Amino acid sequence: SEMCIRDRLKTVPEKLFANNKKVTTFNSLFANSESFESVPAGLFANNPEVDSFRMLFSGTSLKSVPDGLFANNHKVTNFQSAFSKTAIQSVPADLFAGCGKVTTFMSCFTGCSELQSVPAELFKSSGAFTTVTKTAFNNIFKDCTSLTEVPAGLFDGFTLVTAFNDAFNGCASLTTLPAGLFATNTAVTSFTNVFKGCTSLKS
């Protein structure tokens, strides 16, 4: 019966975790709850100690991301696969704002087949320039088959990153790229498969 409940869950009350101020991990919180489609903006507002949101909404039907979802989660280090394989079409520019301790965004938006665009400030607004690991952006937009463009400056300031492996692998709708997309990422040693399967790219 547990499976039945999980598969029908569409959303949760905003104050569900309001009194759980000591929570440090929400790993896989809604992962693979296929019916889950809406998250209240203040769901994590009273959880300032959270360190990891790994696979948070992975494999759900999440349609949109509310502004300020992580506004009070300044200690988070891990966003790996947090939104992977969801139905989101866009993300707010300030989604990671103030999350200055992030170590990885790896695979964060992998398989978001409905995602059409991303804001230029998405990662910069975190301020996590010195805390991200060398592979923090591997697979970041892998298989985002509806993504048509990448904004200039998306990765600006992340000077310690050494790899962007598979970052846009399978982005079949991507038609153009900004000239200086990796201009400030001077430590990079590997771009393996970064634009593999980007069949719409025009020179």
Predicted segments — roles?
Residues 1-5:
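Short, small-residue-biased leader/transition segments that mark boundaries at the very start
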Residues 6-8, 13-17, 24-34, 40, ...:
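Core hydrophobic positions of leucine-rich repeats
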